[in-house]
Amino acid sequence: MRWLAPAPRNGNRARRAPSLAGDLTALTATQAALEIANGNISAQEYTAACLERIAAAEGDVRAFVHIDPEHALRQARALDERRRDGQPPRPLHGIPVGIKDIFDTADYKTECGSPLFKDRQPSRDSTAVARLRAAGAVIIGKTVTTECAYFHPGPTRNPHDLTRTPGGSSSGSAAAVGAGMIPLAIGSQTNGSMIRPASYCGVYGFKPTHGTISRHGALVLSLALDHVGVFARSLADCALMLDVLAGYDAEDPDSRPSAAPEFRAAFATKASAPRLAFVRTPVWHKADPETRTAFEALAQRLGGAATTIDLPESFAAAWADQRVIMYTDMAHNFGAEVERGGDASSQQLRDLVAEGSQNTAMRYLAARDGARNYRAGLAELLTNYDAILTPAAPGIAPKGMATGNPAFNTLWTLTGLPAVTLPLLRG
């Protein structure tokens, strides 16, 4: 790290913040932005409170790979100076945001959790980071990612139980928000890298529709599958971030040249009772018994608002198709770097590249056709329902450092559908 945090301390929970930091860091981003806009607190005060919380918890949680407190405070002071000069506050004015270390940042290295990219210093921000800065965010630091946003874990631990995984690959972003270090962070998902960590760390995670947020300047695993999303402490905060990040970018081939939805306005609109489909996918048997029982009980409590639907066997090949697409694309996009790096990469990543390199064009194209068919099938289902209710993970975060099973995220990533983790149940 660029900043040495306090040494780890014994115990299974991250230590609590000092009282001042605890008071301010308990605010959601929406609340903090309002307090800053009204002049009740300054951007510097709020950033300092977050840094104090980071100093208290980082030795245990290990969510950050690069952080520079003085640089963060300089950003905050510059934002306060703008306000003193009479300039209006921007949507994220003075709000610290953590950046998964696969997104280019002109002021921090971007190493993608891999020795292959050690000391890599981008010359410009990724589109997502540039939009955050333009909205007044304080880019507080880079959060830990698993190696090349794949399975091999980094050092991050679950803030609610240090013996358990935070999930991955967006490990640091989910853990930092879950630990109360920062109110917001960005991550990415190519299989289950946002929805699962959000579930394990007890925060809101929102992966919007494929192409909603630009991936320009982020590590490319698979253009067909890569999504950018957000971690937050409330749905209102997710909407705030989406209003900043969503929108067309000509440098992302999957970005759509159409007006982005107004997420905060939609969130504030009183909605009628939704029609929910409680969906059991072909991997339903992989859920822990406690998860199955809890969701079935939830569906019963919802009564007529939720209809139980078992997806047909025509969806069963989706998990194999996702694997073919992801592995083939990753082998194409950085297989050469992995081969040149030799033992610098984990065996997991080398095995992925080897498998992906063996897939034929015919098998790859069949998997892409499958993805379109699954999406069409789900679109037909959603003509009768407003949303799908289904687990974000098989169960609670596993012990140890393995990042957990993404099986309950795969289908929604493969089909590009939006997904949000709601921290409703606790193990």
Language-model features and meaning:
Residues 39, 94, 100, 134, ...:
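Glycine-rich, small-residue loops and helix-cap segments
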Residues 124-248, 413-426:
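Short glycine/serine-rich loop segments
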Residues 40-48, 77, 262, 289-311, ...:
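Acyltransferase
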Residues 72-74, 82-153:
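Acidic/His- and Gly-rich active-site-bordering loop/insert found
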